[in-house]
Each structure stands twice: as C-alpha cells, then as structure tokens.
Design a protein with these regions (language model features):
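A short glycine-rich, Lys/Arg-flanked "PGG" loop and its adjoining helix->strand segment in the class I
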Residues: 158-173
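A structural helix-start
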Residues: 112, 154-158, 178
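A C-terminal cap/extension of S-adenosyl-L-methionine-dependent methyltransferases
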Residues: 2-24, 52, 224-301
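Short, glycine-/aromatic-enriched active-site segment of Class I SAM-dependent methyltransferases
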Residues: 174-196, 200-205
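A short His-aromatic
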Residues: 149-153
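Conserved N-terminal segment of class I S-adenosyl-L-methionine
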Residues: 1-138, 144-148, 161, 283-288, ...
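Conserved S-adenosyl-L-methionine
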Residues: 212-222
Length: 301
C-alpha cells in the first residue's frame, strides 16, 4: 500500500480507503500540502476547460494519446504507481485509469479547486495537492510520473525536475511534454502564465543534468507546425498594439480556430503523425516530448 506523508495540521498518517483518506477519525477527499499558484490558478483551469472544448482540443487529445502510448512501455503490473502531476480537469487521469486499471494511479495539482471537482467525478483515485518544487512525497516511491504542460508554469523548472527524479524509483520513467520553441514566446504564453517555452536541446541537457537517462525525444504537432509558427510570429508583432482585453479575445479565437470540423480534421492529422512517430522522432513541432528514465545506479559520462 502506498504511504502518503502526513499533511500539515495533522498528527496521524493518512490512509487511502478506496474512496477518501482517513486521517485519525477524520475523512478528507484530498490531501493538501504546499500550495503555489504563481504559474496557474483556478480561473485558468476554467478558461482552458471552456475554450478548449472540454478536453476535446486536437493537440490536447493527441498529447494524452501519446502519453498513454508511452505509459504502455513502462507500465508493468498492478503494483505500478503512476503519478500524474498537473491533473487539472482530470481528462488524462480518466484515460490512464481506463487503459491501466491494475495500476495504482494518483492525481495531483498545485491548487485544490480542480482536484475537488475530480474527486466528485472520479472518487476512486487518490488526489493530492502540492507545489512540485516542495514535493512532500518520499524518495523512490513512484514508478512513473506523467507531467504534461507543467514545467512551463513553474519558475524554477530545474528544481521541479529534480523533485521528479527524487521521487521516482530506480528504473522509473518520467513522461514530459512542454511548449516548444523559446523564440515563439508571446502574449498567448503570458496570458496562460507560461514562464517560458522550450527548445528540445536545452530541455534534454537540463534533464541529463538532473540525473536522467534519455529514453525518447520527439515533438508533437510536426505537420501543423509551419502554420502554428506563423500565427505565433504574428502575435509577437501585434503585442505592442493590443490591450489586455484584445489579447484575451485573440487567444479565445486562436484556441477555437476553425470550430469543431477543423478540430476533427487536425486531430486526424495528429493521429497520422503519431502513427509515423512510432518509428521516427520529429525534429520540431508545437510541443517537446521527452521520456526520461531514472537509472538503477550511477551514470558514467
């Protein structure tokens, strides 16, 4: 049984009952540890939920599908502990639960509001709220960490990555996705509280510096990247001429681009891309995707 650390304000160790946590005589739905919402808040969760068609946006669906495929390579048995960091509205949690019903799945976020909603929709998944940089989990306790679009919301991303390394068991894997191409950082990223976008080379170097071994490196959104890049460059040119309200309107328009029909077409393109991506990595795209491994012993470089 997974042992959760005692949250602040309590003396006894929490026990997961299958529907909630028992701490002494008290039952709680979520374990709440440290909170840091400098790079995310409840309003952004609601905004993304509304504008991205409740998890049906083509790039989000493709990201989740890619993550589940990577999980297939590392998921082992019913004792496998999978931690999703940044569960937000819970779409990936649901898909992992369906795809890997025998695993021990834990959801988490840096703020409690989305977790409270997940606990009502999916009461059978233990949920914990904490700041990744100050992660309360013990060393070597998790087999797989999945963090999609998380690191860009954390100011000290290297410290966050080191925490992921720390809590992984030797031989464990981390599946990471982040926005690609640092030169395309614009007001869209600012409004979504991204501290940065990433270049694949720099992300890989930081990961290796934290002790990881690189298992896979690729990009998502390779086929549609030229159009995406053009839009981002236009945003950078418009930045000085738009007020906050105009930026919000522009972001909503870009997220909803083309409506449901175009969204379905682009998802079909992403499916084709994911199929080809089984045999070859993509050198550029909308998102960087890394699968990292914590080695069993010291690395010789």
């Amino acid at each position: 049984m997974f042992k959760f650390p005692t949250p602040p304000g309590y003396e006894k160790e929490p026990v997961w009952t299958g529907r909630d946590f028992q701490i002494g005589s008290e039952k709680v739905a979520i374990l709440k540890y440290t909170q840091c919402n400098a790079g995310w808040d409840a309003d952004l969760t609601e905004f993304h939920e509304k504008e991205a068609e409740a998890g049906n946006h083509y790039i989000d669906r493709a990201s989740r599908l890619y993550a589940c495929r990577e999980l297939e390579k590392s998921e082992k048995d019913q004792n496998t502990v999978i931690l999703e960091i940044g569960s937000s509205s819970g779409y990936l949690l649901r898909e992992i639960k369906i795809s890997f019903p025998e695993s021990y799945l834990i959801g988490s976020d840096c703020i409690p509001e989305p977790l409270e909603k997940i606990s009502e929709k999916m009461p059978g998944i233990p949920l914990i709220q904490f700041d990744l940089v100050n992660c309360p989990l013990p060393d070597n306790c998790v087999d797989v960490v999945v963090a999609l679009n998380v690191l860009e919301h954390i100011k000290d991303d290297e410290a966050a990555l080191k925490q992921i390394y720390r809590i992984l068991k030797p031989g464990g894997h981390a599946i990471i996705e982040v926005p690609a191409n640092s030169q395309l950082y614009d007001f869209y990223d600012e409004q979504l509280k991204h501290f940065r976008r990433y270049d694949s080379r720099g992300l890989k170097q930081m990961s290796l510096g934290c002790g990881f071994v690189l298992s896979k490196s690729t990009h998502l959104g390779f086929c549609i990247y030229p159009a995406f890049k053009l839009i981002k460059l236009q945003n950078k040119r418009k930045n000085k001429h738009l007020d906050s309200n105009q930026k919000q309107i522009t972001i909503k328009t870009q997220i909803r681009f083309g409506g449901p029909i175009v969204n379905r077409i682009l998802f079909t393109v992403m499916l084709f891309e994911l199929y080809l991506g089984k045999t070859m990595p993509y050198p550029w795209g909308i998102r960087c995707a890394l699968t990292l491994k914590k080695p069993h012993g010291p690395i010789t470089r």
